[in-house]
Amino acid sequence: MNIRQYFMGLLLMGGMLGLGSCMSKPGILVPTNPIQANQLPKIYPDYIGVTVPATIAPLNFNVEDIDAESVNVVVEGSKIGELQSEGDYANFDIDEWHHLLAQNRGGDLKVTVYVEKKGNWTQYKDFDIHVSPYALDDWGVTYRRIAPGYEVYGKLGIYQRNLSNFEETAILENTAAPGACLNCHTANRTNPDQFTFHVRGDHGATLVSQNGKREWLKAKNDSLKGSMVYPYWHPSGKYCAYSTNTTHQSFHAVKDERIEVFDQASDVFVYQPSPHELILDSLLMTKDHYETYPVFSPDGKTLYFCSSTAEPIPSGYKDIKYNICKIGFDAATGKFGNQVDTIFNARELGKSATHPRPSYDGRYIMFTMSDYGCFPIWHKEADNWLLDLKTEQARPMTAANSRNTDSWHNWSKDSHWFVFTSRRGDGLYTRLYLACIDDKGNV
């Protein structure tokens, strides 16, 4: 398994634009006397006004116009430099792109789009792309890719993508384990030297990989109610927290709601790989509550998790609302504290808080808020929130949220970037999005 660290000159054009072009700057050819459109271009993906790291891969895009015959795009840095792409779509030279962004880190890129339709050129309003002053030093991202489905699925896998180009490689695909479902992959603070994920199915197991040494753990044992599902590493690498979940899926019979995924039992525990021992505590394995989604604080002294009162299924499924709780943890002894505290009470707001993820600088906890339940990816109302651990105030991340599902997320190593999932594109497919957060908490 090869897992990587996660998470010039002008473009030479293939041909002249013809007599209807002029040279606005040395080496940059643009149409003469184009029709001026008092609107922004409709492009896909929509990169208008986005903020990007200087190392991001070229933001190539299509113009959403079936009558478009050719596209001419000029990108000019606010500090220095420019580049151009001309053809069926905007397809920037990768070396020129990286050079331009490196020159304009902390500045802006002005993008001018010309579109040819029926032999006539139209120039749209310029838009900006902001180049963040914060570096994204992580190599890339890992993710699971699976087509939207319900009970039956085909090929799926866990993949890694280099964010500075378009290189994608498979970490593991279910073709290696037919009929298996791969999920819940987690590295230790973005370091793939320590990695774990769970395989569901008849031959299911949990993989714990440390510095090239792999250990496959039995999916269930007498001490647990179910498999080792949602993991999170202790920063020391000596422990890994898991939840064990008895999960079910049902179909809705109402408009605009498809699936409900819920737990009928769940507990939290810690696994210590070196002596191959489970660390169990009755405070995290209660009969009248569901405990799930454990995560360690960056200093390793606290274990955060989500907890809801157990409710009857199916009659009480909308009453399952999770709060974010914490308990102390002593890495020297491997023992928990003697008290559980609630740090964010979502139930009081009539909501459910899941997927807590502390920033690695210890300042924030990002989490997903939905109306109820523990699986917000199917909840259109789900948004990501930010809990400030200094002020103890929580707020929705309005700048990054959308009118559709916004859910699972994770931080970059320096805590200035995060990747999250959203269905804002079409309401069906979950795609990955990047966002930046500055020193003042502005997203």
Give the location of each predicted region.
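C-terminal motif of bacterial Sec signal peptides marking the signal peptidase cleavage site
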Residues: 18-21
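Multi-bladed beta-propeller domains
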Residues: 32-46, 79-96, 164-181, 209-227, ...
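Low-complexity, Pro/Ser/Thr- and charge-rich linker/hinge segments at domain boundaries
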Residues: 43, 121-150, 223-224
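Contiguous beta-strand segments within globular domains
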Residues: 44-67
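Short, conserved, GDST-rich strand-edge loop motifs in beta-rich repeat architectures
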Residues: 138-152, 242-264, 305-322, 367-381, ...
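Conserved, compact domain cores that house catalytic/ligand-binding motifs in diverse enzymes
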Residues: 140-224, 230-231
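Residue-level detector of Asp-centered blade-edge/turn motifs that repeat once per structural unit
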Residues: 189-191, 235-236, 298-299, 360-361, ...
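Hydrophobic beta-strand positions that form the internal "hydrophobic ladder"
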Residues: 194-195, 237-240, 300-303, 365, ...
